[in-house]
Regions:
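Extended, Lys/Arg-rich, non-catalytic nucleic-acid recognition/anchoring regions
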Residues: 1-350, 354
Length: 361
């Protein structure tokens, strides 16, 4: 009677396309599909041969980092897609990994959302925990240090970096004071200023590699690439392992497992090119310095290095000249250091200004 009543009300066996049917767990649908294919496979050779593909049609999901799949051959809609194809073959769930380069697609997905260098037009920023960017942050903060209101010597600054930051994960004022007293540099009553409490910057990745990957022959470039991979693919451990196996075949399974336990997130505000390739002559000697050289050899922070005393800003302006896009397009807004919501507001404002100029002639 119950079944007849449900049939009369058109409520018996609701269609899968009905949103109300979504309350049934996905696993139950999959179980039913497998049972149906199992029964049909005993009667039909075609079903039996294609059962796995049918299941894949049901279970397959395009990874979020691959995004919209553009048609083979390209077209106008390609600008909204970042998926990288290995070939122009027709795409199916069962040949997805052979047609789509998931690693490169994931890299593009992250990179298209990251900001560009604050000073150099179009240059990608470094990961926040990059070895180079971490060193920059430490030196930029350390160069503000004052003892009894006076700047410390460059030699002492370098010693603090090597003896404290390179040997201690977190450098506090207490540790700094103890170090200075132990080295005979100052007394207990010394007034430490120029920093806001404890040091905020640290060499996190440097210590991670030193502690967790002992005995592994990795160059500075290799370590930077590993850090970049963790930032790009850290949310997908399987993809990260796959990437590391391909790029570093000399690493053992245990070493790769150790790497996947590391966690680095976020991006800095500066590019490698800005820190290492923008150069200017040293004021006193005329020696060619990069930003990193100047931070190490002086007690000036970045803002001081970009002042008129040094010539770094001239090099920055020379680099940017001719590279900036003077046309009004959303792509030019994309490269600004602003959140997506702010970028939209800037773009809308520019469109209003453009319309006013058109109306005013």
């Amino acid at each position: 009677e119950y079944l007849l009543g449900e049939i009369e009300k058109d409520l018996f066996l609701p269609k899968p396309v009905n949103k109300d049917n979504s309350v049934i767990p996905y696993q139950i649908h999959l179980y039913e599909l497998n049972r149906i294919l199992e029964n049909l496979g005993a009667k039909s050779e075609i079903i039996k041969e294609n059962a796995a593909k049918i299941v894949q049609l049901f279970t397959f999901r395009i990874p979020y980092y691959v995004g919209p799949i553009h048609a083979a051959g390209g077209g106008e809609k390609d600008k909204f897609s970042w998926a990288v194809r290995k070939s122009d073959e027709k795409l199916y769930p069962w040949n997805f990994d052979q047609i789509i380069d998931t690693e490169e697609s994931a890299k593009r997905f992250i990179r298209r959302m990251t900001n560009k260098c604050t000073y150099l037009y179009g240059e990608d920023v470094l990961p926040k925990d990059s070895l180079l960017y971490s060193k920059f942050m430490v030196l930029n903060e350390l160069n503000n240090l004052r003892l009894d209101g006076e700047k410390i010597s460059v030699k002492l600054k370098q010693k603090i970096y090597n003896e404290l930051f390179c040997k201690t994960r977190k450098v506090t004022q207490k540790k700094l004071r103890s170090f200075l007293i132990r080295e005979g540099v100052t007394e207990k009553t010394v007034e430490i200023s120029g920093i806001d409490g404890d040091f905020k910057a640290s060499l996190k990745a440097y210590h991670d590699f030193k502690e967790k990957l002992t005995g592994v022959a990795l160059s500075q470039e290799d370590k930077e690439e590993i850090i970049l991979n963790i930032v790009l693919f850290g949310d997908d451990k399987k993809l990260l392992k796959q990437r590391l196996h391909k790029q570093f075949p000399n690493l053992t399974e245990n070493q790769i497992k150790s790497i996947t336990t590391l966690s680095y997130q976020g991006w800095g505000r500066l590019s490698r090119k800005f820190l290492e390739e923008i150069t200017a002559p040293a004021p006193e000697t005329g020696e060619v310095w990069s930003i990193m050289n100047a931070l190490w050899e002086t007690n000036d922070n970045l803002m001081q290095l970009l002042s008129q005393e040094y010539k770094f800003m001239e090099s920055v302006e020379e680099y940017n000249s001719g590279r900036e896009d003077r046309t009004l397009s959303y792509e030019s807004i994309q490269n600004t250091y602003a959140s997506p919501s702010v970028k939209r507001q800037i773009w809308q404002t520019l469109q209003v200004v453009k319309e006013i100029r058109t109306v005013m002639g």
